[in-house]
């Protein structure tokens, strides 16, 4: 196959689309594709060589995309590599416009998508250009200032692009990336997220084994140990998981994951966020940063297999632990994740198995033998996931996930999964009361259908279920239950498609050597006929009940309801599938039955009639000759008989019988055209008779008949979709149909029977057109010319005939021709349309009716608009005709899209992902070939725009602005489609649309005005004319939109018009992307283009450009860039002109300002006239305008920023660093090292003089130096090399002068500050980053020039305690501090002399409304700044924050502000943190709750830096351990006492010092706040320290949930809940357990009770870490069993609950010793009861014996409750043991009753199944127990 192809083509294609080979005109395709490819290579190469990015390069890259869509990668490897390299160069052009970049990127992704086609030897791509692109866009420094507008989709496109290029990065890339990004790894900083994001995206993982040393081995140990040591799920952990999953999947067998497997599974389990225990608090970040399931499944499936089998053990453990969550009765927000896990995991394993066993080997490294999945591995996997999947079938989220999982599992092990599904399906088919069970089981059966029917050696008995399933499914065709009906149709269709319905029962006698199974199947196949007939009866019943009630309104009559149309579709497609698969004998019987049904009664034509007609159509389509013989003569004679009566033709309401026969006829002719030729005379007779009926319904049906006849004759389509080539045959001696059950189609043996129009058919089509279409066209023409007056109804009838004639025959009519419209654009590269051959050779000698219709319709439209504009129905019809004249060649785009979607759905529901290689069923493959034909038919992009299109589009525009909104709306939709089809026609149409908006014109109606605006707005999918991304276009549309505000047709009273302008503004702002002013192409691109022009096979056509042309190209490139600049400046000038017009309404002023703000860019400064306008607008009286102006001026200031010189320094040359680098080991570590100590804040070495300041080496970015130093550190050059500070006005440029003059003007500033200190939205205002940017820019660009004017304002505002003035001054101050980054020392010193008093004052005036703003102010001021530059600020903030002055609230606020500043500084201020801690420690006993909470939060930040990460030095910041020691010493009074701690402190300051105990309780409250806040924030929990506080917490935490408890108790409870969820390392487990062990001996039963709840959560959230430590499991078990015998009843009961939970998640197992232990306990003898005296007290204290007996009973009931959904082998006996205790004393009796009632509740659903597990005697006892009187007692 391949060889022939390459000889014909002249090269061997990389990978073409095979379906093209099966088209009926395949012989013409090679020449066609070669010609197109040669054009693409030639023109794309030339476009790059001539430097014409637009339109040349863009146009021809789009052509390449289309080429790939039509032919696949049908080019040789050399071309493939050249295309990739060229596009890579294009994508990475530095100044390229984003929309073009995306367009190239998408094509490059397509070219790289099949990575097996190009190996690393063929292609190498550099990584750095992509990194620079990603960095420029994702971390843009100018986007937030509005200097760059990126589309929202760009991030996703870049990600996929990098993914596609990753396999081809050079081998040195990994090391280079690590050097680049490792210095960013500072875990407290946002740069950590950046580094991890880059690692995840860029690190290559597909290097061959010999290069692993240059690949993952460089980073794996570092990153995995980092991952292992992080405990609290920071946001970047997700990136690591994704990276590890990819690494594992790409290198199966080359990495030893075993040491990490328990940790991996523990974290996966934690990440599911399942609820455990009753009082669990979830940490919110666990939800937001949870792992993405799609990575988790890749990781798991890559870990399976291999020698150790450990992953499978853990996976089984995982599913055992979570199975019960899948039970349908459980529901919560975690369910979606669980379902996704179930659905994706089998798919992922199938994918892996396909790669191991079936995929053609590629250059990618194969999996080593040792790690391939063995048969046993697969079985184990399926066994482990089977139970949850079966439970999930009935889940609340629907059965879809389970069905997909089962489909994949059935491919692996049909014998394990299909039987249990069948067990659930058969009863579901019988039940009447639970229809949802039927829907669920059927959808799962559909998934496993192919595995079931194919049988195979694993599951030979599969096919036997086929017939019973089909027969039992029939009752599902139920008119009363819509969803049941639909799923039944789907089920029947799926199964029948796989099986030829042939009765082979006689083969048993006539053939020898059949196996037992084959014999059974043969005899069963006798049922097929019965099945088909029963199905037909069911359908009849369905139709009878759905006959249309006559009560519907006339309008609704037109359409069936949505549900009805779905049922109709389901019915007709299922019926046609069944008939297609029938043998001729069965078909004949069904045909007679349908024919009788259809012809013996008369149906109304709307619902029932349509369904019956559909069934008849299906029968005729299957075997046209046999069926037409019956139907056609019958219908024709019936119609002729009734219509013989002349009066009938003019009746308004037609005879029902006539209508029904006409409807039936119009459907049954939808068959192969050649079959219809036999009946041509009858058909013509009927058409002539009925096309001119008076009744609209009548002639519509006649038109439909005509349309169907023409289509059948003129289109290319497959004749049959049977599952076996050559149709269904009877069995013979050599052939047995049974063997074809479930057989996939063979791609190279499809034998598609095509219908291709014969000469005879074409003749007949044109005969019909001449006979029927021509007279109508003449009639309409006469009407237009005024020679013959026709009524509106007749016009409509004529149009209807014209339209249907055209729709039916359009594929034979050549497209419209005409002269191309000249001068829309001028490029040097040719742009021509691609002609795609679709099997039709147009006969040019015949009349081209497409042209004729066009010539008649245009004058008719004109006539109608002038004389009868209200004839809406005719206009509708004309719009449809114009649409089809332009585009229609036999298939509609939307129908094609729907078919493509449904094809994909069916493919997914029935595909075999394990074997791959297109093993679909035959019908599906034929469908795909047909879709390929239609795709070619619809390929329209890049058509030349000709004069005839221009005329029609102008007509559409006229209709789009007509008087009636319905007409406008329809015409606009057609117009938008047309605009997207023809090259550059928008440029032609925009001026025409804008004429309607011209303010000079007085003749434009409001409707026209609105229509024109809608034309500019566009629809949601198509083009938006108002915002085409070209300077020439927006230079026209934007000013016109603004000026239209002065048009007489514009009225702001009309809400619809106001809304339109809002929508337009909104759409433009949403969609605008910065348009480039630089269209240059670099040399590197041109070199590759020249190579491409020299390549061969096929030779590029046209060839390379001459030198002359190249020079011309360069000249044009320069000119184009110049033009762009001019157009940009002109547009800004035009918009400003509009604004200076006094008459412009306010709405339009705002619109214009919005447009102007989009004109800010980072590569060109804004023209000074616009700068002046924006600066003046800062004091505009409209808030909206002021806000836009603030943003704009901030952006302008960024444009005017003079670049500060930076020098690259090797970090090790910095004087401070040199001295500290003695030991070499240190440099490998991160954290506080000698070589980064000089960066830290040290009050003894602060730059307090000019000299110190100049000598100090400032490093502003906080993360530098924490991890490794970068190779080259960029530092600011010394002051004398920087731009001059304090420029005089003369030294400034014009833009700077404008700003300088305004901000030096006292009045301007007064007004500006007054506006800023107003309230915008009451109570909703926040600190505004925009205003901060504005002030930062002012002080950065102009130093302290404006301070003198602002100073009095700041002093006034600080003194005003109202919210808005405070916020305003906070914004100014933060901008001032950040703006002073490069000021000279003297200026900075003066600044702080001014600021410190202001800030002191502000902090003493702080209020509840403003403290957050001040926090933001200080945090913003300190972000990314060297702390040594801000020492004045820190020293000022550290002056006794908690003084009590101004009350507790002010204290809390001051702390908050201080925390904001210190948190930004992270690890660089250890000294300040120590000072703060020292200062706070004595104050931890604060009385006020708000101060306590704040101190708790501050402590979290103080200790944030104390992390336990790998390769990290111990921190010099405060450490938790030392702090905990000191705190514990102060809590002594509480830890020593035994009694429970009550909070008896009244919150008020009592004089004098209270006793130690009271102080300790206050301290404890603050410590609790600290523990709570740090739970979710820090990276690692300090477990050993927390453990020492545990005993105390257990003492306080209450047992019951009660809101009336005080704060301390609830806090303790929260802390315990949060701590129990913490991630534990394996070495911490013994510590925790010994702590718990100790507390369990405490005298307080509250503590003992709480231990159990703590234990439940802790074990579940660290399940696999515990399980991998056998001693720990024993200890936990012993602890629980001991507490089961606790003297306190509540503790015993809790221990039982805990035990049952542990058993349920398989942490503990029910073994012999445990069962024996409980049984012996439960048999403890109780002392005999003596006759008690009434009221004696002795008996209330439980004796030790009673406790032991109760413990035994509790243990037994725990066992029973641990398996709520099934009955294990040990359960019946335990139930019997329990029942013996029903009459024991309390509390035993209660326990037994409760257990029995729970058992009954949980096992009730599937009792039929569960009953099997008990013996008859046991059942008797049980039934007795469960319904005996004691149950009600």
From Swiss-Prot:
The keyword Hydrolase does not apply. Pfam families: HEAT_PSME4, HEAT_PSME4_mid, PSME4_C. Its main location: cytoplasm. HEAT repeats lie at residues 460-504, 983-1022, 1164-1202, 1344-1382, 1626-1664, 1670-1708. GO terms for biological process: DNA damage response; DNA repair; proteasomal ubiquitin-independent protein catabolic process; sperm DNA condensation. GO terms for cellular component: cytosol; nuclear speck; nucleus; spermatoproteasome complex. InterPro entries: ARM-like (IPR011989), ARM-type_fold (IPR016024), Blm10_mid (IPR032430), HEAT_PSME4 (IPR055455), PSME4 (IPR035309), PSME4_C (IPR021843). Residues 1095-1122 are annotated as: Disordered. Keywords: Cytoplasm, DNA damage, DNA repair, Nucleus, Proteasome, Repeat. Residues 1640-1728 are annotated as: Bromodomain-like (BRDL). It is found in: Cytoplasm, Cytosol; Nucleus; Nucleus speckle. Residues 1111-1122 have a biased composition (Basic and acidic residues). GO terms for molecular function: lysine-acetylated histone binding; peptidase activator activity; proteasome binding. The keyword Repeat applies. PANTHER family: PROTEASOME ACTIVATOR COMPLEX SUBUNIT 4. Homodimer. Interacts with the 20S and 26S proteasomes. Associated component of the proteasome that specifically recognizes acetylated histones and promotes ATP- and ubiquitin-independent degradation of core histones during DNA damage response. Recognizes and binds acetylated histones via its bromodomain-like (BRDL) region and activates the proteasome by opening the gated channel for substrate entry. Binds to the core proteasome via its C-terminus, which occupies the same binding sites as the proteasomal ATPases, opening the closed structure of the proteasome via an active gating mechanism. The bromodomain-like (BRDL) region specifically recognizes and binds acetylated histones. Belongs to the BLM10 family. This is Proteasome activator complex subunit 4A. It comes from Danio rerio (Zebrafish). The lineage of its organism: Eukaryota, Metazoa, Chordata, Craniata, Vertebrata.
